[in-house]
Design a protein with these regions (language model features):
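Multi-pass membrane catalytic core of lipid/isoprenoid biosynthesis enzymes
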Residues: 29-46, 86-132, 136-137, 174-190, ...
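Solvent-exposed interhelical
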Residues: 146-180, 217-222
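Membrane-embedded alpha-helical segments that form the functional core of polytopic membrane enzymes
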Residues: 34-83, 134-139, 196-216
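Membrane-proximal soluble regions of multi-pass membrane proteins
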Residues: 1-24
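C-terminal ends of transmembrane helices
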Residues: 18-23, 75, 95, 149-159, ...
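Function-critical hydrophobic alpha-helical transmembrane segments in multi-pass membrane proteins
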Residues: 133-151
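N-terminal beta-alpha supersecondary unit
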Residues: 9-12, 26-51, 165-169
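Acidic (Asp/Glu-rich) catalytic motifs at the cytosolic membrane interface
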Residues: 67-105, 214-233
Length: 250
């Protein structure tokens, strides 16, 4: 029962999908980050469904864009927007953290979101769906969430409140780190074997950037920064997928 509750906690927090409601406690939150990558499977499955449906190309590209937003409810985009505002302020660390707590959406957040979706839509329109590409993209969506969960358990926290702090303090960090590190390694090897190592490289590059920006600009990670990482990793991996197809690798 605790196993199923752990999955439900992950889906309740990081997706908009309806799941049974449980009282969150130490037991069912301990390994919630280990279940986080399962949401990537759902996103990938729906992405593949959109790929096989007889849709016009523009409609298919739009569907590819909307799938992750529909599944997650935009929780990661919210973090991306808030972090974009904070980084664009060029204020000190305290100022940036204050902006992250502000519920209002600033001008830079709107600009960055518009640019993000233009780039995402363009890349979705450039990707040719094949079963192999669909499998690689699904694995990539799982990988980015495995890396995000690993970061919550391994990277320093910027503050002692908020979403990242809640899950980090509730987690069995050593077990979570080992599990997600092993899962990430397996996914990276699988992607490389399928000829899409570029997607794995893009995810790792985004993780490296995430760590150094979080540490330098904010003193550690927050829930908003986790969303910022996830959206950037997804865009970079999508670009890698498109480039792999243009180069004839996939």
């Amino acid at each position: 029962m605790t196993f199923l509750q752990t999955i439900a906690v992950a889906f309740a927090m990081f997706s908009a999908l309806p799941v049974p409601q449980f009282e969150w406690n130490e037991k069912n939150m301990r390994y919630a980050m280990c279940a986080f990558p399962l949401i990537g499977l759902v996103c990938g499955g729906l992405w593949c469904l959109c790929g096989v449906l007889p849709l016009p190309e523009l409609a298919r590209a739009a569907a590819f864009c909307l799938v992750p937003v529909a599944v997650t409810g935009g929780i990661h985009l919210d973090g991306y927007a808030d972090t974009s505002d904070a980084l664009s302020s060029y204020g000190d660390r305290e100022k940036k953290l204050e902006i992250l707590k502000d519920s209002h959406c600033g001008a830079f957040a709107v600009i960055r979101l518009c640019c993000y979706f233009v780039a995402y839509f363009g890349l979705c329109g450039s990707v040719r769906f094949t079963p192999r590409a669909g499998l690689c993209w699904t694995l990539a969506l799982v990988l980015e969430r495995a890396l995000s969960g690993f970061a919550v358990a391994a990277f320093p926290l910027a503050k002692d409140t908020g979403l990242a702090h809640t899950f980090a303090t509730a987690a069995d960090k050593q077990t979570v780190r080992r599990f997600l590190c092993g899962l990430s390694a397996l996914l990276i090897l699988t992607l490389t074997a399928l000829g899409s190592g570029g997607l794995a490289a893009a995810a790792l590059l985004a993780l490296w950037r995430y760590y150094f920006v979080a540490k330098k600009q904010f003193g550690g990670i927050t829930g908003d920064l986790a969303g910022w990482f996830l959206q950037r990793a997804e865009l970079w991996m999508l670009a890698a997928l498109a480039v792999s197809q243009w180069g004839g690798v996939l």
